[in-house]
Amino acid sequence: MSIFARVAGTGSYLPELRLTNQDLVERLAKTGLETSDEWIKTRSGISARHFAAENELTSDLAVRAAEAALSSTGINSADLDLIILATSTPDHLGGFPSTACVVQDKLGAHTSCAAFDVQAVCAGFTYALAVADAFIRSGSYKKVLVIGAETFSRILNFQDRGTCVLFGDGAGAVVLEASKEAGILSTVMHADGSQRDILCVPGRAGNGEVRGSPFMTMDGQAVFKLAVKVLEQVAHEALDKAKLKPEQIDWLVPHQANIRIMEGTAKKMGMSMDKVIVTVHEHGNTSAASIPLALDSGVRSGQIKRGQHLLLEGVGGGFAWGAVAIKY
């Protein structure tokens, strides 16, 4: 008998501090950096983003999203077998202890609930779903919490107009459970380390110092060109693996990086933007959190309904990309 990983529920959280484009324009002007609401919107589709408070950690955002997801299912944290957290901005320098372990403790999950982080930047949530799906299909775990959470505001260079206006903080989560009913239909992951320098944090820690820049850097044109190309390819791979055609997809739920990338991908897929869940205008690029944020938004708005076919896809630094086909 086949076992599927079914999406039992979703949840999300955005920090209280919301900065509109104009708020950011005024903040940057104080440091001598010029930009405008029109410049930001035209190039990205972003109108606002949320930043975590000084005392708010990635794990705090993750817990809020996780609690919302659990609440939507009636499943308790004590019932969880596994927690997988996708993040590039962990609570601790060096990435350990894992932020997933911190979340496990804050949620009050049992020590029998395993917990670990996955790092694939903006593709992280698709990677985490693929890992969770494999564990559930193998029969190893029955109830898995998958989270994408980021505090990217802490690695932004506010002297770099090309990046600091694009990113925000947030978290999204899904609860997966073993089911006889179809859920996750296919997963595909890819990586190309030769493209690692076009989107990265170049600094390295050593002997108590950061050698190189501690801020993220991005070659925007190179990222755009590669992203549109690989997203179309991986989307078709996931659909072929799930034995679906593009016209059978009810909703494309893409990584919310840039409206132009989403429009380019939809066009190459032959899909109308009316079938794309778009939330980038509300929170900017939240890296690993963006797909689950968009997914939960679609569920809460009533756009995404049970029985519909969804295609999730994301691409990020590494270079890494992935896609997941789901019957919701």
UniProtKB/Swiss-Prot annotation:
Keywords from the named record: Acyltransferase, Cytoplasm, Fatty acid biosynthesis, Fatty acid metabolism, Lipid biosynthesis, Lipid metabolism, Multifunctional enzyme, Transferase
Keyword DNA-binding on entry: no
GO cellular component: cytoplasm
Active-site annotation: 122, 255, 285
UniProt region (ACP-binding), positions on chain: 256-260
Main EC class the enzyme belongs to: transferase
Keyword Lipid biosynthesis: yes
Pathway: Lipid metabolism; fatty acid biosynthesis
EC number: 2.3.1.180
GO molecular function, one term: 3-oxoacyl-[acyl-carrier-protein] synthase activity
Catalytic function, reaction form: malonyl-[ACP] + acetyl-CoA + H(+) = 3-oxobutanoyl-[ACP] + CO2 + CoA
GO biological process: fatty acid biosynthetic process; secondary metabolite biosynthetic process
Localization annotation: Cytoplasm
Major location (coarse): cytoplasm
Domains (record comment): The last Arg residue of the ACP-binding site is essential for the weak association between ACP/AcpP and FabH.
Cited function: Catalyzes the condensation reaction of fatty acid synthesis by the addition to an acyl acceptor of two carbons from malonyl-ACP. Catalyzes the first condensation reaction which initiates fatty acid synthesis and may therefore play a role in governing the total rate of fatty acid production. Possesses both acetoacetyl-ACP synthase and acetyl transacylase activities. Its substrate specificity determines the biosynthesis of branched-chain and/or straight-chain of fatty acids.
Subunit structure comment from the entry: Homodimer.
Similarity remark: Belongs to the thiolase-like superfamily. FabH family.
Name of the featured protein: Beta-ketoacyl-[acyl-carrier-protein] synthase III
Gene name linked to the record: fabH
